[in-house]
Amino acid sequence: MSNWPYPRIVAHRGGGKLAPENTLASIDVGAKYGHKMIEFDAKLSKDGEIFLLHDDNLERTSNGWGVAGELNWQDLLRVDAGSWYSKMFKGEPLPLLSQVAERCREHGMMANIEIKPTTGTGPLTGKMVALAARELWAGMTPPLLSSFEIDALEAAQQAAPELPRGLLLDEWRDDWRELTARLGCVSIHLNHKLLNKARVMQLKDAGLRILVYTVNKPQRAAELLRWGVDCICTDAIDVIGPNFTAQ
């Protein structure tokens, strides 16, 4: 297998802005638009279940409240993660990573799993997500693991070294070369605003694949692809579709 089997366009948090993020419903919406790869955020419940949620807290994307990682899975099961977005999605639950893997299998979709630890749980979350991903995605294209948290990526590297890893950065770091080498990363995942053509060439010359987020304007997506960016992560999954090209 190539170390980069992934498509050009990735649906951010499953269904971009067209569904409640990080839910099975959002993955179905991404699939409906023909997307072949999704990005989503994974963290641990207090009792060690791996589920999808972006924020530390529940308030923004559910009717729950407080720090999600301080609750047991049975409590998190009661949370409605759909109504905040639309009545159409009322009762949509927080999904387990195992359910997401099954949905990816059904839809033939690849995955970028962002390891999103609750504050202070980086190493444990990195290890648990990597070990689970190895089992759950067996026989499928390996999921691309990424994180802003260095300690989470280190733990993922130790737990499942064969799974591809990407370093996430929201600000440029001059030590990107050393960091990606130490973590054995195949890719670097950057806020697209950090990039110009020269930086893209520099990263590519170092042998890294480049994923950028979150690009919602087709003109910008086309420019980035022309520069040599490998992957565009977008919320505008209807406008920047799975067959989008730089032309």
Swiss-Prot record:
Residue ranges annotated for the GP-PDE domain, each copy included: 7-244
GO molecular function: glycerophosphocholine phosphodiesterase activity; glycerophosphodiester phosphodiesterase activity; glycerophosphoinositol glycerophosphodiesterase activity; magnesium ion binding
Top class in the EC scheme: hydrolase
Activity sensitivity to pH: Optimum pH is 7.5.
Annotated active site: 12 (proton acceptor), 54 (proton donor)
Gene Ontology biological-process entries: glycerol metabolic process; lipid metabolic process
Gene Ontology annotations for the cellular component aspect, listed alphabetically: cytoplasm
Superkingdom, natural source: Bacteria
Keywords: Cobalt, Cytoplasm, Glycerol metabolism, Hydrolase, Magnesium, Manganese, Metal-binding
Note, other: There are 2 isozymes of glycerophosphoryl diester phosphodiesterase in E.coli: a periplasmic isozyme (GlpQ) and a cytosolic isozyme (UgpQ).
Name the record gives this protein: Glycerophosphodiester phosphodiesterase, cytoplasmic
Organism expressing this protein natively: Escherichia coli (strain K12)
Taxonomic lineage: Bacteria, Pseudomonadati, Pseudomonadota, Gammaproteobacteria, Enterobacterales
